[in-house]
Amino acid sequence: MSAADTTATPSALPGVQFGTIARHGDTRGAFRELWRARSFPDATFVQANLSTSVAGVVRGLHLHRRQDDLWVVGEGRAFVALVDVRPALAGTGVAVVETRELDADDWVYIPTGVAHGFLAVEPLQLIYLVTNEYDGSDELGFAWDDPVVGVPWPTLAVTPDGRPITSDRDAANPSLSDLLVRIRHAPD
């Protein structure tokens, strides 16, 4: 992405970047440049994925110790929650939460050690590039609604009971404190 193709905004979390891609459209449709290597010189993306979600889905909170992510919203709207657990992992502080609402053409770069999840506010297509191929041993997660973490998720009006739609895996995730204990006691 060149300076003409994207705009970036700062984050409170070290290494996290937010931005918006330029959409070039005419009567035929639209074109968007999703990624350019020189815009992320320290990241070597090796796999691209496409996730689709119906409104009301929460995915996360997921954590990788060996993978950076670049998310691009293809279509729809997402409430994105990022939780920097690097200070907690190092034993030097507590997790820090940052949230943003991202629309089509918005992107976020998520470095290793920053947990991430989203709520599909409306039907959502999320494209994500990652710096490592899928590795199940690096698929960590903690409860999206962990009260100690306190992500300020928006109220849901898209499901009858106001609860999000989650996967069985995400619904079974432990608390962040339990995950940190497991990580600290696991061999590298």
Regions found by a protein language model. Name each.
Residues 1-104, 123-128, 132-188:
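Non-catalytic, conserved peripheral segments adjacent to functional cores
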Residues 101-122:
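Conserved metal-binding segment of the jelly-roll/cupin
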